[in-house]
Amino acid sequence: MMSDQSKRQGMSRRELLASAGTAAAGMLLLNEVSGADNPAAKVGDRASSIKITGFKTYPVGSKTLLKIETNQQIFGWGEVSQLPPTVAGPLVQSMFELLDGENPTRIEHLWQKLYRAHRDYRGGAFMLHTIAGIDMALWDITGKLHGVPVYRLMGGPTRDRIRVYPTPKAYKVPAGGPRPASGNPADIEPLVKSVKEARERVGKDGTVMFDAHCCLPPPMLIQFANAIEPYDVLWIEEPAVPGNIEVFKRIKQSVKVPLASGERDRTIWEVIPYLQERCIDIIQHDCAHGGGITQMKKVAVLAETYTVPLAPHSIASFLGIAASFHVTASIPLFLIHEYYANDCGGTLKKSWEVDKNGDSSLPQGPGLGIEVDEAALAKIDPTKFKWPGQKNPDGSVADY
């Protein structure tokens, strides 16, 4: 037999359930009424129904421009950089099997799918350069779909301009190719002279960098680095062959000039040893070489945890530069960006401007912010790609 208190509690529960049911019915009615009057309620999620339907490739010298098409007449452009078109084209065609019919806004999923589809093919320049071009196009599509620049999809801009080089106030001295290494101080004299002249050219407030291109043996590199200390060099680039962490550590322990590398370290898995061993000061990730926007953003975040800034490497066209600019615009730790104007024979129109001080505005418009003249692009005669064949003074194979 229920007590008076239990009855009161039971009544309270019944009343509560009854009132909840009434409220639910009221909300349903309200939704029906507001749905009729509110245009926003009728808008579907376009991102859930968009599908990849096709692709096209256009060879331009050592680059292949890539177009990915969708069922919503939104397309995206990317660049497969520094691969023979005879390699890039078939690779894109082969990888398209993994993309056909997929939702292009699932960028991370598709990156993982492309990279991990065959475990024996993971990594390496051919795969990562190709994935980079595809990844750029997917971000371009997603930005256009939502009507925003790509950097808006990555947390928004952290800066309103991007410092670039080379400019009259920022100059990188090249190594000039392999040199004999006899152990003589005379071996490095021409290089030291080039750095000194560069400093005089840009002035005290300018920026001087040196690109070693892995050309100098470690003892010679150390000797050279110590000799250029008075000229306040921002960095020595690629002081050793990428991946040889022990050599990087040895050099880092022997010099005061900051060391930079990363253009050929294409993923977070290749970058992490440098950071863990504290043997470089600046990461030079290349968006077009290292898996595209998706991987570059991860490298930047990883480097941030070690307080190592990004100074992106780039020898890409405006398409590849745009992709790199969008990541650069969205990260906190940035130093300076390599930049060479390349519109692929007048077929690419950029959406930023570089001022006389070497500062670039951010890309504008939805997606990557690049207009492509596809008709003109289709008329370009592909030039035959020639494999480089560098040699040391004695005829042996050189890295640069």
Task: Give the residues covered by each predicted segment.
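N-terminal secretory signal peptides
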Residues: 1-11
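N-terminal export leaders
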Residues: 10-29
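C-terminal segment of N-terminal export signals and the immediately downstream linker at the start
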Residues: 30-62, 66-68, 75
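Metal- or metallocofactor-binding catalytic centers and their adjacent structured scaffolds
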Residues: 71-145
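Conserved, mostly hydrophobic/aromatic
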Residues: 73, 134, 147, 211, ...
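Shared catalytic-loop signature of beta/alpha-barrel
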Residues: 86, 93-97, 102, 109, ...
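Metal-dependent enolase-superfamily TIM-barrel catalytic cores that perform enediolate-based chemistry
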Residues: 161, 165-254
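Extended hydrophobic packing segments that form well-structured cores
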Residues: 368-400
